């Protein structure tokens, strides 16, 4: 007998009086009145429904004059709903009708349940059958109208195709709670177009609109409430996936994209109201995904992760005393059963069931669980399910939370016939302790380390709405959680659309929460995560790299460090993922060769590649350059290398690559045409001059190469091969082949951009110049700016004799006496022209190279001093780099010590900033404190070049 506390009864007095006014014409026995008042006291929901629908509820609430609640047969729900819907003409009326039926039937079911007139299994059957009927009859009502409006969706045999509704979770298992949401997936049999008199629709569009209308009928909150909360997050790709999916697409998804937690979800999946052919097709589709042919102990690890997600989420929300999600709750019983189902279900057909009860019996028969333990588990499970129903029947709320307020506790005690709260709490605690102990036997105990390892797993799984996700991110101290969440969502959506196989998906699932933790702990989480994701996106289909990062903390640490320090590095890693191999050994990453050893390192990269395999050699050179450049950048960022050494290493690397490229070009050309007389691989009769930054040993990250090709070969005669060509043509083809090797874009990118415009006569000149012609041009025809460029030129490839010849030509040309006034005017005019075209006008940013007081001014000053005084001081021709030339000028008293140091200091600072900008992927300096350095440069400029 339901006997609520007197305090509860008095609190419902007003509601009872209001109810009697509405139903004054209805005669109740004293016992019936007492029962109704008690129900109102423990369930405000029943009271509200009785007051709102008196003519539909109370007139036949009791079975005659007795105390039993009159329930309709569960199998008649469908007919009753169909009959009611046949009397409405639009969706608004349909919504009102469905909500009235739902509230009245649920109120009576709640009453019968509370009064213990139905068993738990009977009530579960009622709730689930009503849900099936509401879905099926609503869909039938809508489908008929959609066909009239848009035509018939027909299959290849001209048969009308229904929309297929897949029930998940407790609905799928026919174990629905009193106030539960329903988890659905929508599908349709075949692609095509509707057939009808009006405008045809693609089947996907037709079923999508139909699904939206069905959700509206059931889920929309109107003045009359809801029928069911509809949750679509279990569909393929979750919230980002299509609302309705074809069966073929569904099959492809679970074969290629299905995740571990979806296997658990699919254990209970069933089609609701579908013909047998579709149900069979669905089960054949899903069975290989859910039940593996082998014993699958990996299911345990997947379950532990899912349980950890639930634990993290309940802790985040501050949830306590939750009889479903807490330790020892309903979900753990389900997990115990489902873990065994997924491990052995592929071999044991008796475990392929949606029912907890049937599956538990199967486990006992297979000796997988002790019979007494199974009996106690089911008893405890049923006890918690009864409490779950009572909690929800209080106010028709989907809750599994034990009440903390006095009224809620009194209501629950009354509904469960418990005299006091402490007794009930103790029974619940004992029940959940037994369940949790059994759960730990199956999946192992949890630890804080497990949670640390999983990191932010809950953010990566598609189980959170936006508000919950943002709350988690914000709780981690992130200033702009929305930006971070958008990055995560977009990347997650893209990753699920790209096939990487089960192994790849598993590795990505392990990696992503860890990387999220790295990003969130950083000062600029959004910036770091964006760079990390660009790299992970690039290797998503390369499982080995995902596993490398997931399993190698050192590699992850270096990746985060380098990506945060430099977007240029992250871009290089994204473009060339093979560089991730360099992160495995941090000690090796920061260990650089000596400048003189780069040639030997390159040879190691190429030594195992057959000479005739030019394509592989080209890729290997590119990969070597990228790997070595990454090591230089890593050493730069960590402070291992100083500025001058960075450029030294980058320049030495470029020289070694030039030597290898010329060698490769020579070998492939001579194999075809033979070689000129008196030449060989070690003495090609060919030299490469480096100009600009390479010539000045001031190369930066991403710098191109300014090159000039010269030869001392005799152009008379032909090569000595089977297909001989003229010697001049040979060297032209050699230059073309060198350019090809440098600039062709392979899968590994390009080697270097090469600029040959500084050769004699520029773009109009020959690609290769004979040394005599080279000397004559520089001596007789070169413009002042070409002589300035020559100051920074030096041989970077060639035998010593040819290098010496070229340097002698350079020295001879630079040492010519020049008209001081004419030289000064020419240099000033050229610089003014550059400023006019290259300076960023009206910009607060500083162009380190071109703006007044920048690098170009220092270079022009240096070049002026060489061209002005080298005829008198040949020492000025020894070097091609600015710092040593300025130092030499000071020692020759061509500059004061102050001016020389100011120029050198400014140049080194600007170069350092230039390296930093390159690593940041920028070209202009935004905020700087370099006004003093710029002014010192301008003072020198004015003193040397402007003052008369």
UniProtKB/Swiss-Prot annotation:
Identify the stretch(es) annotated as Adenylyl transferase: 453-948
Pfam families for the chain:
GlnD_UR_UTase, GlnE
Any one Gene Ontology molecular-function term assigned to this protein's record? magnesium ion binding
Q: Which cysteines are joined by disulfide bonds?
A: none
Give a GO biological-process term. Answer: regulation of glutamine family amino acid metabolic process
Adenylyl removase: annotated span: 1-447
Identify the CDD domains for this entry. Answer: NT_GlnE_GlnD_like (cd05401)
Tell me its cofactors: Mg(2+)
Q: Which GO terms describe its cellular component?
A: cytosol
EC no.?
A: 2.7.7.89, 2.7.7.42
Reactions mediated catalytically: [glutamine synthetase]-O(4)-(5'-adenylyl)-L-tyrosine + phosphate = [glutamine synthetase]-L-tyrosine + ADP; [glutamine synthetase]-L-tyrosine + ATP = [glutamine synthetase]-O(4)-(5'-adenylyl)-L-tyrosine + diphosphate
The record, for NCBIfam families, names: PRK11072.1
What the record says about family reads: Belongs to the GlnE family.
- Per its record, how is this protein called by name? Bifunctional glutamine synthetase adenylyltransferase/adenylyl-removing enzyme
Q: Which organism's genome codes for this protein? A: Idiomarina loihiensis (strain ATCC BAA-735 / DSM 15497 / L2-TR)
């Amino acid at each position: 007998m339901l006997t609520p506390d007197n305090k509860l009864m008095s609190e419902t007095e007003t509601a009872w009086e209001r109810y009697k006014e509405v139903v004054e014409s209805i005669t109740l026995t004293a016992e019936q009145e007492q029962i109704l008042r008690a129900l109102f006291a423990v369930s405000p929901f029943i009271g509200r429904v009785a007051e709102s629908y008196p003519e539909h509820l109370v007139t036949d609430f009791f079975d005659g004059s007795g105390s039993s609640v009159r329930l309709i047969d569960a199998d008649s729900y469908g007919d009753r709903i169909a009959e009611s819907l046949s009397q409405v003409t639009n969706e608004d009326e349909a919504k009102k009708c469905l909500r009235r039926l739902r509230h009245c039937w649920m109120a009576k079911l709640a009453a019968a349940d509370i009064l213990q007139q139905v068993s738990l299994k009977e009530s579960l059957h009622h709730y689930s059958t009503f849900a099936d009927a509401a879905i099926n009859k609503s869909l039938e009502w809508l489908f008929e109208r959609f066909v009239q409006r848009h035509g018939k969706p027909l299959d290849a045999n001209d048969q009308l195709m229904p929309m297929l509704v897949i029930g998940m979770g407790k609905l799928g298992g026919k174990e629905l709670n009193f106030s539960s949401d329903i988890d659905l997936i929508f599908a349709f049999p075949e692609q095509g177009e509707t057939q009808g008199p009006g405008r045809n629709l693609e089947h996907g569009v037709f079923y999508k609109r139909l699904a939206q209308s069905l959700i509206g009928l059931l889920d929309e909150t109107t003045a009359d409430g809801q029928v069911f909360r509809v949750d679509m997050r279990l569909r393929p790709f979750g919230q980002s996936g299509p609302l309705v999916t074809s069966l073929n697409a569904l099959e492809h998804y679970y074969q290629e994209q299905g995740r571990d937690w979806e296997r658990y979800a699919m254990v209970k999946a069933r089609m609701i109201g579908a013909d047998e052919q579709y149900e069979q097709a669905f089960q054949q589709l899903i069975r290989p995904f859910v039940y593996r042919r082998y014993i699958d102990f990996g299911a345990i690890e997947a379950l532990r992760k899912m349980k950890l997600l639930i634990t993290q989420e309940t802790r985040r929300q501050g949830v306590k005393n939750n009889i479903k999600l807490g330790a020892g709750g309903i979900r753990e019983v389900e997990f115990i059963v489902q873990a065994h189902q997924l491990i052995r279900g592929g071999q044991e057909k008796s475990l392929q069931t949606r029912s907890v009860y049937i599956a538990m019996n199967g486990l006992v028969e297979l000796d997988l669980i002790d019979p007494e333990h199974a009996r106690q588990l089911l008893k405890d499970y049923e006890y918690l399910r009864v409490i779950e129903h009572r909690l929800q029947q209080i106010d028709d709320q989907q809750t599994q939370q034990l009440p903390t307020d006095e009224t809620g506790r009194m209501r629950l005690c009354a509904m469960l016939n418990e005299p006091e709260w402490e007794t009930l709490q103790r029974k619940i605690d004992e029940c959940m302790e037994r369940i949790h102990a059994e759960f730990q036997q199956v999946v192992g105990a949890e630890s804080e380390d497990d949670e640390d390892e999983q990191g932010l797993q809950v953010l990566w799984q598609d189980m959170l709405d936006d508000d919950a996700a943002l709350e988690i991110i914000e709780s981690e101290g992130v200033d702009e959680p929305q930006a971070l969440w958008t990055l995560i969502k977009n990347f997650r959506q893209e990753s699920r659309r790209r096939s990487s196989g089960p192994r790849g998906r598993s590795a990505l699932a392990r990696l992503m929460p860890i990387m999220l933790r790295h990003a969130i702990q950083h000062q600029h989480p959004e910036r770091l995560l964006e760079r990390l994701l660009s790299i992970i996106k690039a290797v998503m289909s390369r499982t080995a790299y995902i596993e490398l990062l997931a399993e190698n903390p050192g590699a992850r640490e270096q990746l985060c460090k380098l990506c945060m320090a430099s977007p240029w590095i992250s871009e290089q890693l994204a473009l060339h993922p093979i560089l991730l191999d360099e992160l495995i050994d941090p000690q090796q990453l920061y260990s650089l060769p000596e400048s003189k050893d780069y040639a030997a390192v390159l040879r190691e990269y190429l030594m195992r590649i057959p000479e005739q395999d030019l394509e592989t050699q080209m890729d290997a050179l590119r990969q070597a350059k990228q790997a070595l450049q990454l090591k230089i950048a890593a050493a730069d960022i960590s402070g291992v290398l100083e500025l001058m050494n960075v450029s030294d290493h980058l320049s030495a690397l470029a020289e070694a690559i030039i030597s290898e490229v010329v060698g490769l070009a020579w070998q492939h050309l001579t194999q075809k045409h033979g070689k000129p007389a008196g030449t060989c691989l070690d003495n090609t009769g060919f030299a490469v001059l480096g100009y600009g930054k390479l010539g000045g040993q001031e190369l930066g990250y991403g710098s191109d190469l300014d090159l000039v090709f010269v030869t001392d070969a005799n152009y008379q005669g032909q090569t000595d091969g089977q297909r001989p060509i003229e010697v001049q043509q040979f060297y032209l083809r050699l230059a073309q082949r060198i350019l090809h090797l440098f600039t062709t874009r392979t899968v590994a990118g390009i080697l270097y951009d090469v600029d040959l415009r500084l050769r004699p006569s520029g773009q109009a000149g020959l690609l290769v110049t004979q040394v005599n012609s080279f000397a004559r041009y520089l001596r007789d025809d070169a413009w002042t700016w070409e002589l300035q460029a020559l100051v920074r030129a030096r041989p970077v490839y060639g035998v010593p004799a040819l290098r010496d010849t070229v340097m002698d030509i350079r020295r001879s040309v630079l040492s010519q006496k020049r008209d001081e006034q004419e030289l000064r005017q020419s240099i000033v005019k050229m610089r003014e022209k550059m400023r006019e075209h290259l300076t960023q006008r009206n910009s607060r940013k500083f162009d380190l190279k071109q703006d007044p007081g920048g690098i170009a001014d220092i270079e022009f000053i240096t070049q002026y001093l060489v061209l002005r005084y080298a005829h008198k001081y040949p020492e000025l021709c020894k070097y091609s780099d600015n710092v040593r030339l300025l130092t030499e000028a000071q020692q020759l008293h061509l500059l004061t010590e102050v001016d020389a140091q100011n120029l050198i200091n400014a140049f080194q600072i600007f170069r350092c900033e230039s390296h930093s900008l390159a690593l940041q992927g920028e070209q202009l300096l935004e905020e700087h404190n370099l006004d003093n350095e710029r002014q010192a440069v301008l003072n020198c400029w004015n003193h040397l070049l402007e003052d008369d």
